[in-house]
């Protein structure tokens, strides 16, 4: 797998997202702008300027009409994908660490930081998909995280629940209409934060990554842990591959803890695990520093990773990836 190296950011990557068609990649970094790229050749489609601080998060609606971003300047911004125009800015008391559209992009959730006496919150905003129409200032729902702040969050199937990962390693399930807390489960080791939460294609289950060096596959309905992937390094990101039963994990020693310059020493590789058998099946090297974010093409043709080194690496899966099977899987096919 020869990667395409995308060099559009001057500082560490924070998040990568593919659009639903898998042909455009959006990336954010700590350098105040969002980049859009063509996935097949790495050509830059454009940049979105306006934020006044590190951008932590981005998401794109299913029709690739609008994108939303959250940043350290305490704002959520809505952008027109085609023109790069900022359609709306919502102000908050603290930094916004995660944004995600629901399945039909009529609502957007935003996770805010706990800081300066303000508690961490999950806020839901109503979205108008017409780029020429007005956007509402009102918050449709505010969930306050009094126990432990939320670090990541997302919408389950049919936008039924809001699932949040917390700083204390727990995962919560909220009713998306009322904001009522339905479940809270200690999925990861106490006080080691959940660093990422990404969905299966049908949003009935999700994968979490954590500083406790594990990733977990969790059922969205009852927060039951179905699979555990054990690694030897703190994880920053985890993603589920469609088509094949794999998960991709990314992490590495924290940048400030790195004392050696060898990429091998810091464990800066994307790791592939078998989703069902929980075994590591391969690694992809390349980043010079921890992997901060991994994202998989929704069509299952490839994946992208973003690192502390400021690069996005886009990989197209080759034939060997699609042909790979466990002996058990081969036996089942032959029957």
From Swiss-Prot:
Any one cellular-component term (Gene Ontology): eukaryotic translation initiation factor 3 complex, eIF3m
Keyword entries, A-Z: Cytoplasm, Initiation factor, Protein biosynthesis, Repeat, WD repeat
SUPFAM superfamilies in UniProt: WD40 repeat-like (SSF50978)
GO molecular function, one term: translation initiation factor activity
Family as reported in the entry's similarity comment: Belongs to the eIF-3 subunit I family.
Subunit-level organization: Component of the eukaryotic translation initiation factor 3 (eIF-3) complex.
The protein's name: Eukaryotic translation initiation factor 3 subunit I
Organism expressing this protein natively: Sclerotinia sclerotiorum (strain ATCC 18683 / 1980 / Ss-1) (White mold)
Gene that encodes the chain: tif34
């Amino acid at each position: 797998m020869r990667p395409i190296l995308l060099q559009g950011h001057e500082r560490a990557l924070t998040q990568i997202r593919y659009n639903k068609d898998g042909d455009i990649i959006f990336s954010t970094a700590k350098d105040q702008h969002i980049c859009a790229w063509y996935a097949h050749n790495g050509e830059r489609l454009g940049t979105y300027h306006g934020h006044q601080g590190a951008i932590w998060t981005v998401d794109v609606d299913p029709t690739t009409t609008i994108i939303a971003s959250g940043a350290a300047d305490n704002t959520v911004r809505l952008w027109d994908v085609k023109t790069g125009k900022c359609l709306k800015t919502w102000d908050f008391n603290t930094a916004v660490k995660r944004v995600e559209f629901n399945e039909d992009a009529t609502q957007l959730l935003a996770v805010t930081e706990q800081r300066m006496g303000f508690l961490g919150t999950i806020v839901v905003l109503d979205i108008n998909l017409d780029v020429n129409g007005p956007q509402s200032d009102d918050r449709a729902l505010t969930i306050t995280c009094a126990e432990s702040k939320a670090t990541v969050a997302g919408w389950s199937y049919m936008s039924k629940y809001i699932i949040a990962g917390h700083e204390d390693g727990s995962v919560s399930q909220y009713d998306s209409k009322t904001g009522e807390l339905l479940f809270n489960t200690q999925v990861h080791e106490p006080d080691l934060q959940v660093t990422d939460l990404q969905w299966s294609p049908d949003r009935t289950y999700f994968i979490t990554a954590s500083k406790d060096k594990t990733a977990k596959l969790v059922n969205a309905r009852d927060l039951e842990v179905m699979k555990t992937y054990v690694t030897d390094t703190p994880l920053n990101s985890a993603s589920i591959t469609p088509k094949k039963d794999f998960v991709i994990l990314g992490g590495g020693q924290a940048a400030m803890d790195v004392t050696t310059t060898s990429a091998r020493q810091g464990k800066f590789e994307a790791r592939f695990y078998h989703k069902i058998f929980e075994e590591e099946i391969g690694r992809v090297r390349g980043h010079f520093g921890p992997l901060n974010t991994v994202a998989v093409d929704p069509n299952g043709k490839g994946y992208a990773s973003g690192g502390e080194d400021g690069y996005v690496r886009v990989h197209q899966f080759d034939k060997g990836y699609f042909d790979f099977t466990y002996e058990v899987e081969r036996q089942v096919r032959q029957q």
